[in-house]
């Protein structure tokens, strides 16, 4: 299933190019605001594997779509993208919205392994247009998740705006992710707030000179209904896995003793 939309960011125009019966009520809702969503709360996020104690990692509040806010470890650190895509349901298309400054500073979307036929990409004129496009996209039951990238700390991105996104995500059963590039963690209505950055790759199992699996360090610093924490994660075929942090210590501290 592929859904393509032609959208004039900031102009309030949404035109469906390929009609899809599963999204028809939601498309009508984008234009009239009167349609009811058909989404169910457990469809937008994937909970992978068994419990975390067995080495797998499950997203806090998995199965309960809401608004998550992600802060990049540095303005041009793209590690958050791998962390985010490792959690999402790839069975439905993603709506990915970027404002102009986010594109200029960090580039357009190019996620390896993501079928471009399942990606709806919107280049928004400004942060206000990003918020508008995200809120409208959350009304579509056929969308797997809505991702929005905003650069800096625009005045329009206040508590009320983030609260609106959180309510829309929970009402319609579609997960929303607001990515803050070069932003400050001010007051927000997001239920989950993260700091995510790239971490050293794992050792390659066959070639010690080659990079292994990519890893990310994710800090959950605010959460409703979940304990904050920090994890190092690797994306494997069946989901995100916990990875042990490297320890910098002497051989004596590690328990090794000199013999002979």
Please report, for each region that a protein language model flagged, where it lies by residue.
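Detector for small/aliphatic-rich hydrophobic stretches
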Residues: 1-96, 100, 107, 116-117, ...
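C-terminal regions of RecA-like/P-loop NTPase motor modules
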Residues: 2, 226-260
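Structural motif
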Residues: 69-71, 95, 144-149, 177
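A short acidic, amphipathic alpha-helical/loop segment
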Residues: 80-86, 133-134, 161-164
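Long, charge-dense
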Residues: 97-158, 162
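A contiguous pocket-lining binding segment that forms or flanks enzyme active sites
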Residues: 150-206
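A conserved mid-domain beta-alpha-beta active-site/ligand-binding segment of alpha/beta enzyme cores
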Residues: 206-226
């Amino acid at each position: 299933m592929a859904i393509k939309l032609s959208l004039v960011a900031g102009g309030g125009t949404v035109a469906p190019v390929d009609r899809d019966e599963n999204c028809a009520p939601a498309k009508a809702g984008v234009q009239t605001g009167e349609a009811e969503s058909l989404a169910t709360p457990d469809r937008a996020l994937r909970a992978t594997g068994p419990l975390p104690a067995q080495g797998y990692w499950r997203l806090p509040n998995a199965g309960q779509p809401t608004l998550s806010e992600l802060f990049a470890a540095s303005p041009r650190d793209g590690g958050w993208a791998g962390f985010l895509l490792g959690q999402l349901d790839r069975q439905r298309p993603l709506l990915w919205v970027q404002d102009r400054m986010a594109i200029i500073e960090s580039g357009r979307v190019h996620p390896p392994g993501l079928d471009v036929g399942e990606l709806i990409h919107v280049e928004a004129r400004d942060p206000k247009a990003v918020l508008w496009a995200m809120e409208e996209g959350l009304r579509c039951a056929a969308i797997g998740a809505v991702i929005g990238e905003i650069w800096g700390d625009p005045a329009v991105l206040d508590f009320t705006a983030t609260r609106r996104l959180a309510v829309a995500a929970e009402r319609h059963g579609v997960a929303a992710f607001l990515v803050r590039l070069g932003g400050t963690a001010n007051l927000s209505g997001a239920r989950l707030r993260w700091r995510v950055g790239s971490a050293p790759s794992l050792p390659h199992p066959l070639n010690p000179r080659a990079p292994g699996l990519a890893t990310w360090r994710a800090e959950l610093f605010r959460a409703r209904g979940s304990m904050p924490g920090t994890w190092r994660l690797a994306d494997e075929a069946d989901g995100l896995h916990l990875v042990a942090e490297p320890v910098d210590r002497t051989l004596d501290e590690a328990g090794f003793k000199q013999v002979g």
